[in-house]
Amino acid sequence: MRTVMNYIRPYFRRISLQMMIKIGGTVIELFLPAMLSVIIDDYAKRPGGEGGVWLMGGAMVLFAILAWLGNCIANRMSTTVSREITRSLRRDLFRRITALSAAQQDAMTDASLISRLTSDTYNVHNMIDRMQRLGVRAPMLLIGGIIVSLVMEPVLTLVLIATLPLLAGTVIWSSKKGVPLFTWVQEGQDKMVRKVQENMAGARVIRALSRTKWEQNAFGEVNADLAARQRKADLTMARVSPLTSFILNASLAFVVLVGAHRVHMGYIGAGKIISFLSFVTIILNALLMVTRIFVMYSKGSASAKRIEAVLLTEDDLTSKAMEQEQESAHIVFEHVSFSYNKRYNNVTDLDFSIGHGQTLGIIGPTGSGKSTLLSLLMRQYDADEGEIRISGKPLQSLSKEELHSRLGVVFQYDFLMADSIRENIRFGRDIEEAAMLDAVSCAQASFIHEKDGGLDFELNVKGRNLSGGQQQRVLICRALAGDPRILLLDDCSSALDFRTDRELRRALRERHGLATTVIVAQRVSAVMAADLILVMDKGRIIGKGTHPQLMENCPMYRELCQLQLGGDAL
């Protein structure tokens, strides 16, 4: 909760003002039963006391209106403060999530991060809001009601106070049980979010393979697990309210019995007992409010801890200041090995270098480590062994901003936002119109000019109103528009026809010849003109050289060429 308190601290003045208004309204509420007692015992029984009844009754109405207005104003202020605190918390949480390394995202899972950004922040919002509304009001009504009751009728008040230890024990028990239970529920919600996310992403494949029923059953299992968790948590917490109500009603009945006896014996008047019972009702309602506060605190505290776990996560990809070495090569991998799970290597002993302005082609079967190599170059992960250098600088010595400013990237499975083509290409960067048009031309994306509005044509979610090849060309435009010094293309032309692919590669050589280009591809034709080609299999480089060299000394490359190009490969 310490981190969440840092977000609340700037609003202390507004919270204090709201609490002062709440205190004023609560104090007024505490006067009302005493005024009722005066009306019944003093004015109603006195001859000619009608004027006093009307006067005191009018004062009660005025006080009730003032208390209502004060509570309305305070509640509005608490809602505004809670909304602003949650907005700041959600903003910083989103920024921290986007700054997490790939390894940290893998550890926390996307589903859990989405859940923390949505339902957990909502729970924290409710906790802050309820604590402002009831955190002062409930204790004041409880303590104030007990004090006034003690002054008014000590015997009956002591009867009521005798039940408080039972209530306190119930509240403490619910608080201790609640936090771990609701943390467990949120973990179940993470699983459900992950299942929904998988089904939304793979909806077309699921329908195409007629696996809809199977996925519905799988979702049903996850949903049933979440329902079971919620049921256990809700049933545990649901015991609190009935138990509290039983204790309160039992104490109220006992107070009424004792009070009736004291009225019958003439120790107190009817007005005083009615007023006292009003205070008892106030005290009991305040106790119920306290119970609700603890239930809400249990939910909010569990969510706050999950949010703090993300906000307090330190960068695991730190930059280290090092002396720059003079090196002619632009990109160097020196005996690099890496493992995702730290048990077996996904890539082993990667060793190569490529000069400024040259093209590196990477080819190999699925799962050979091609995309992992790019992830290491982009420093989504740090290598376990070996060293990666860019322009003579170890990758760890470059800040994220410095590294990413050099890169232009098109991933194998990239995304387009539901926005205009212009904004998808700009992607928040300050890019001039001329640079965007040049990128459109180079990426062979002339179809954009044929769309209604050109660059201002609106895309659907994930660009689904474009064909696969058109989507890839818009993504290539995005990478080229920033004029990168290193261009990483991860199988980004797989949906292009051979003619468009050939024109794209020719335009890249002519217009971006100064950039070092790394091409990951399944097609031999996409890499055969590269200055250096890496042939990868099972995480290792099994062939390295130019196209003619590999045709002579790499059987796998030669076989790929013969399968894809036929006689043209020889």
Predicted regions and their residues:
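Hydrophobic alpha-helical transmembrane segments of ABC transporter permease domains
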Residues: 20, 24, 28-32, 70, ...
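An intracellular "coupling" helix at the cytosolic face of ABC transporter transmembrane type-1 domains
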Residues: 9-13, 78, 99-103, 119-132, ...
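Helix-loop junctions and hydrophobic alpha-helical segments within the transmembrane domains
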Residues: 93, 97, 206, 307, ...
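Juxtamembrane helix-loop junctions of ABC transporter transmembrane domains
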Residues: 20-21, 25-41, 63-110, 114, ...
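Transmembrane helix-loop-helix hairpins at lipid-water interfaces of multipass membrane proteins
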Residues: 9, 15-73, 150-155, 266-270
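ABC-type nucleotide-binding domain
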Residues: 326-570
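ABC transporter TMD-NBD coupling linker
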Residues: 201, 280-342, 382-385, 389, ...
